[in-house]
């Protein structure tokens, strides 16, 4: 498993977790801006929780969210800035039958508006049925 984050602080926490749970033989951590520093390989599954909060919602976030770095939350005007980059690059990193699982929080309307050509499978969670989506490599390949 390759785990990626652009934040050195987030990777420090991840390193502690890897050590605490004895996962060093199964998990490699990479400081990278999305796919930029990943090894050249293809993955069966890519799971991503990018910053997706739109600029209008950023200013209205409850106080407890303000303890999180803005880098971890802010997704640009419509919340889809990094999602666009992920969807564009993911096919190069997904195996032929690979899938992308992407969390977008409460931004489904923005996702649908930004990507009307896509028909993801919306995955149910305990919290909701429209915050986590699955797309195949085939769906992402023009």
Language-model segments: residues:
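Conserved Class I SAM-dependent methyltransferase catalytic core
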Residues: 77-137
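Flexible, glycine-/basic-rich loop-and-beta segments that form/coincide
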Residues: 139-142
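Conserved SAM/SAH cofactor-binding pocket of Class I
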Residues: 1-59
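Phosphate-coordinating loops and pocket residues in cytosolic domains that bind phosphorylated ligands
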Residues: 31, 67, 113
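Structural signal for short hydrophobic segments within the conserved structured cores
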Residues: 28-30, 71, 121
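Mobile active-site "lid"/loop adjacent to the S-adenosyl-L-methionine
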Residues: 51-81
């Amino acid at each position: 498993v390759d785990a990626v984050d652009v934040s050195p602080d987030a990777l420090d926490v991840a390193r502690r977790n890897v050590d605490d749970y004895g996962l060093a033989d199964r998990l490699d951590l990479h400081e990278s801006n999305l796919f930029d520093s990943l090894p050249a390989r293809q993955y069966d599954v890519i799971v991503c929780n990018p910053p997706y909060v739109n600029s209008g919602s950023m200013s209205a976030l409850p106080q407890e969210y303000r303890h999180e770095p803005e880098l971890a939350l802010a997704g640009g005007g419509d919340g889809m800035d990094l999602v666009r980059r992920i969807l564009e690059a993911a096919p190069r990193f997904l195996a032929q039958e690979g899938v992308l699982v992407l969390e977008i929080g409460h931004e489904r309307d923005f996702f649908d508006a930004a990507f009307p050509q896509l028909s993801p499978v919306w995955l149910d969670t305990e919290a909701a049925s429209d915050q986590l989506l699955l797309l195949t490599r085939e769906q992402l390949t023009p």
